[in-house]
UniProtKB/Swiss-Prot annotation:
Catalyzes the prenylation of para-hydroxybenzoate (PHB) with an all-trans polyprenyl group. Mediates the second step in the final reaction sequence of ubiquinone-8 (UQ-8) biosynthesis, which is the condensation of the polyisoprenoid side chain with PHB, generating the first membrane-bound Q intermediate 3-octaprenyl-4-hydroxybenzoate. It catalyses: all-trans-octaprenyl diphosphate + 4-hydroxybenzoate = 4-hydroxy-3-(all-trans-octaprenyl)benzoate + diphosphate. The keyword Membrane applies. This is 4-hydroxybenzoate octaprenyltransferase. Its EC number is 2.5.1.39. PANTHER family: 4-HYDROXYBENZOATE POLYPRENYLTRANSFERASE, MITOCHONDRIAL, PRENYLTRANSFERASES.
Length: 296
């Protein structure tokens, strides 16, 4: 195909728009979804996850995160133009139609559903509330005072699904990890919301940063503390090897650095602090990986 032909240019433009809707150029959301899923897979499989299961969760996570981003932009299409960080998104620029976004969301969800084929029926069953949470979260910002809590539930469902896929059951340690991840998500997404707080107040969007008001930093740190405490409880429940416990002082240091950074409440610093949570996910994965190695 001639790269200068109208058809090629049209297809290139659509592909660019769809990839931007999916946040394909911003992998942080996928990583923050993958880390807890990997924690669960490694714990449930004693450090040796089945490759087919690992591939299904990795690809499925990318697809569902992408679908969530598309439906989020659809839900926020009337607001994104008024927010500094989102004013260049496809809907805000008038580059995409509502029908296109809905069809793309459906297509991505269909592809994600195909990833369930090699998994057991319990995992299929648990995918239904996960799908519901992922697709409805963007609309909670209109009426729920802490939508980040709802997002935490959506971002944590990969954990019980992973345990279900490996062992065909969801033991107590899965729910401890689930609750810990809800708190971690609430912490880092509140920091994310702090970056948009001024704009959200103007347009009337509800976020945890708006709801917590001047206590937003305290709320973030309480959630971080609860997350780390529950990870310690999890370690005790599973009889974690020494390597697991090395993560706690490292994570506490990273959390303190986040506290020192967000005290300024500067928009860009809050956004960079949100991105830094990828390190916490990586540290805990490394600790869990090492635990499964040394516990054998």
């Amino acid at each position: 195909m001639n790269p200068k032909s109208p058809l090629f240019l049209r297809l290139s433009d659509r592909l660019d728009v769809y990839l931007r809707l999916m946040r394909a150029d911003k992998p942080i959301g996928t990583l923050l979804l993958l880390w807890p899923t990997y924690w669960a897979l490694w714990l449930a499989s004693d450090g040796i996850p089945d490759l087919a299961v690992l591939a299904a969760f990795t690809i499925g996570t990318f697809l569902m995160r992408s679908a969530g981003c598309v439906i989020n932009d659809f839900a926020d299409r009337d607001f994104d133009g008024a927010v500094e960080r989102t004013k260049n998104r496809p809907f805000a620029q008038g580059r995409v139609k509502k029908k296109e976004a809905l069809l793309l969301t459906a297509f991505l969800c269909l592809l994600a559903a195909l990833c369930l084929i090699p998994l057991n029926h319990l995992t299929w069953l648990m995918s239904l509330p996960a799908l519901f949470l992922a697709l409805t979260y963007p609309f909670t910002k209109r009426f729920f005072p802490i939508p980040q809590l709802y997002l935490g539930l959506a971002f944590s469902f990969g954990i019980p699904m992973a345990f279900a896929a490996v062992g065909n059951s969801v033991p107590v340690e899965a729910w401890i990890l689930f609750t810990a991840n809800v708190l971690w998500t609430l912490a880092y997404d509140t920091v994310y919301a702090m970056a948009d707080k001024e704009d959200d107040l103007k347009i009337g969007i509800k976020t945890s940063a708006v709801t917590f008001g001047r206590y937003d930093i305290a709320a973030v740190m309480l959630c971080h503390g609860g997350f780390t405490l529950l990870m310690a409880v999890l370690g005790a429940v599973i009889g974690a090897a020494w390597a697991y416990w090395t993560a706690i002082p490292i994570v506490l240091l990273l959390q303190y650095r986040q506290y020192a950074a967000i005290k300024s409440r500067v928009r860009q610093i809050c956004f960079e602090t949100f991105l830094a949570n990828n390190r916490i996910g990586w540290v805990w994965f490394t600790a869990i990986f090492a635990h499964t190695f040394f516990a054998k």
